[in-house]
């Protein structure tokens, strides 16, 4: 099954903007499986194929689908991967450092020239094993996105508002804390914004929802080039919309099936979810 942070991110973001992907796959990975992304204006010239096994993550969800239990992480070719950005990638204005070894995230940052907005994600595996490197990445980006459990784990603070303030004190201007089916918060030093999750009766697989959220968020920002507070809030809603599509199917199936009209309708439905100043039927 096609997976990986970059895969979900690219499938989501490509609905809004061309994407340049950087990563590595093993010799066991049929490269033609990536054709579905290439057809969506995703430049794969930064994806290397190396001898060895592809990265693999194994996990399970119990009653609470907001929490993934990691059963196994096999780095494979990622263990020796050193990202080398094509020269044509180095002028990228909007950079998202997906969930990989934070040392590799730092290497990517060292190769891009002057990004307008750099954002990063991480996970419990890296927080446990390379916390100092995770903090080094956070100190260099404009925005960090992570889920509520990761925010608590990284900061040692149970209160999410306090955790967000702690993260803001360590470098980024914006912190997004995702709470799965309960929505997402965006914090700055001056403001707090909340977007609900889309209410779904049927959910197939929550894997990749966070990366799809990031793709929707960064894709919208790259499309508009607008870093105003209002547009960042709209980007959170677009991220939530894309995440809601991702969980409606397995792998990136739904992200490939949908079109602009589907996205517009869902964003409108998000607006209706939080509208309280219009007249309602008696």
Question: What do the predicted segments below correspond to?
Answer:
Residues 9-19, 220-222:
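Alpha-helix C-terminal capping segments
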Residues 1-11:
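Short catalytic helix/loop segments, enriched in acidic residues and glycine
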Residues 11, 57-60, 183-187:
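Short beta-strand scaffold segments in enzyme catalytic cores
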Residues 114-117, 124-194:
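Conserved phosphate/ATP/ADP-binding segment of small-molecule kinases
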Residues 33, 104-111, 132-136:
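A short acidic, amphipathic alpha-helical/loop segment
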Residues 15-97, 109-115, 264-282:
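Conserved N-terminal subdomain of the carbohydrate kinase-like
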Residues 160-282:
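Conserved phosphate-binding/catalytic region of the ribokinase-like
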Residues 13, 147, 210:
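Short, conserved phosphate/pyrophosphate- and ester-handling motifs at nucleotide-, phospho-/glycolipid
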């Amino acid at each position: 099954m096609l997976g990986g942070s970059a895969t979900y991110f690219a499938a989501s973001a490509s609905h809004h903007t061309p994407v340049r992907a950087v990563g590595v796959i093993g010799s066991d990975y049929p490269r033609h499986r990536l054709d579905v992304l290439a057809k969506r204006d995703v430049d794969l010239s930064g994806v290397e194929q190396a001898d060895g096994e592809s990265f693999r993550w194994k996990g399970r969800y119990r009653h609470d689908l907001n929490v993934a239990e990691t059963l196994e992480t096999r780095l494979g070719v990622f263990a020796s991967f050193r990202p080398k950005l094509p020269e044509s990638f180095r002028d990228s204005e909007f950079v998202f450092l997906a969930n990989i070894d934070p040392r590799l995230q730092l290497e990517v940052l060292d190769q891009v020239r002057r990004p307008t907005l750099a954002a990063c994600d991480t996970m419990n595996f890296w927080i446990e094993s390379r916390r100092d490197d995770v903090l080094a990445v956070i100190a260099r980006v404009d925005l960090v996105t992570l889920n509520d459990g990761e925010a608590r784990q990284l900061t040692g603070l149970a209160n999410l508002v306090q955790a967000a303030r702690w993260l803001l004190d360590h470098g980024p201007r914006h912190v997004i804390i995702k709470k799965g089916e309960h929505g997402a918060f965006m914090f700055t030093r001056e403001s707090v914004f909340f977007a609900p999750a889309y209410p779904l009766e049927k959910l197939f697989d929550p894997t990749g929802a966070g990366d799809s959220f990031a793709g929707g968020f960064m894709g919208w920002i790259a499309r508009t080039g607008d870093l105003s507070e209002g547009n960042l809030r709209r980007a959170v809603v677009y991220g939530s919309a894309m995440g809601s599509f991702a969980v409606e199917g397995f792998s990136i199936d739904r992200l490939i099936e949908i079109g602009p009209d589907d996205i517009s309708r869902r964003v409108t439905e998000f607006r209706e979810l939080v509208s309280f100043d219009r007249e309602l039927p008696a």
